[in-house]
Amino acid sequence: MDNKIVYVVSDSVGETADLVVRAAMGQFPFAPDIRRVPYVEDTGTLKEVISIAKSNRALICFTLVKPDMRQYLLTEAAKEGVEAYDIIGPLIDQIAEITRQVPRYEPGIVRKLDEEYFKKIEAIEFAVKYDDGRDARGILKADIVLIGVSRTSKTPLSQYLAHNKRLKVANVPLVPEVDPPEELYQVSKEKCFGLKINPEKLNHIRKERLKSLGLSDGATYANINRIKEEIDHFEKVINKINCQVIDVSNKAIEETANIIVNAVQNQRMF
């Protein structure tokens, strides 16, 4: 038996229709000859496909979300004696009836969702790779650069922005004994956000951190004078960069993230 030609017609890439057709044709002992026709936007293209399908005695399977395009293809194919199968239309109509919601009728939704998912994964991987100043090269690649002393929520904030806002975030810890990476002075100051914290608040946070690790809270790490020294160093660096500073002393991560996102959006508007 000759291979049956199937024209897969779509207003997007056509992956959904292609997969469904291959799954169905897999139930038969002959290889399908699938010819994809993607990104169909006008009835002229549909008319041409119908004509070719008629001459090849082919089947048309399609995923067109716009009702007028779907109806045109079904009507014109029937006039020409061409079999046309609507893969997605009846399901959209059924869901609309059950939910009493109006469909968006927007082509390529699945692909757009996939792209958003991969952007999120890419942002999360970026945050891990360039966490805690591990690789200064990330500073110049980042959408956002967080700067602060230890225990100012740089890491969880980086992950939150990556996971929820799909932003690539690098974070840089500051200590007096180590010069900040040169990249910190090369990146646009609009991308940088200094995370400021009250010395007493930081003192409490660090003591609790040491206790959770089974260490003495009298270590230099939690010493108030040491903390003030670190904050002084932080302020000198931030003043040199001249970037926005956010006081995170009494802010939840979500609140700080919203401030950053709003600042970024405002910058893009001007």
Swiss-Prot record:
Coiled coil: none annotated. Pfam families: Kinase-PPPase. ADP binds at residues 148-155. Keywords: Kinase, Nucleotide-binding, Serine/threonine-protein kinase, Transferase. GO terms for molecular function: ADP binding; ATP binding; phosphotransferase activity, phosphate group as acceptor; protein serine/threonine kinase activity. It catalyses: N(tele)-phospho-L-histidyl/L-threonyl-[pyruvate, phosphate dikinase] + ADP = N(tele)-phospho-L-histidyl/O-phospho-L-threonyl-[pyruvate, phosphate dikinase] + AMP + H(+); N(tele)-phospho-L-histidyl/O-phospho-L-threonyl-[pyruvate, phosphate dikinase] + phosphate + H(+) = N(tele)-phospho-L-histidyl/L-threonyl-[pyruvate, phosphate dikinase] + diphosphate. InterPro entries: Kinase-pyrophosphorylase, PPDK_reg. Disulfide bonds: none annotated. Its EC number is 2.7.11.32, 2.7.4.27. The keyword Nucleotide-binding applies. The keyword Aminoacyl-tRNA synthetase does not apply. It is an enzyme of class 2 (transferase). Belongs to the pyruvate, phosphate/water dikinase regulatory protein family. PDRP subfamily. Bifunctional serine/threonine kinase and phosphorylase involved in the regulation of the pyruvate, phosphate dikinase (PPDK) by catalyzing its phosphorylation/dephosphorylation. HAMAP family: PDRP. This is Putative pyruvate, phosphate dikinase regulatory protein. It comes from Bacillus cytotoxicus (strain DSM 22905 / CIP 110041 / 391-98 / NVH 391-98).
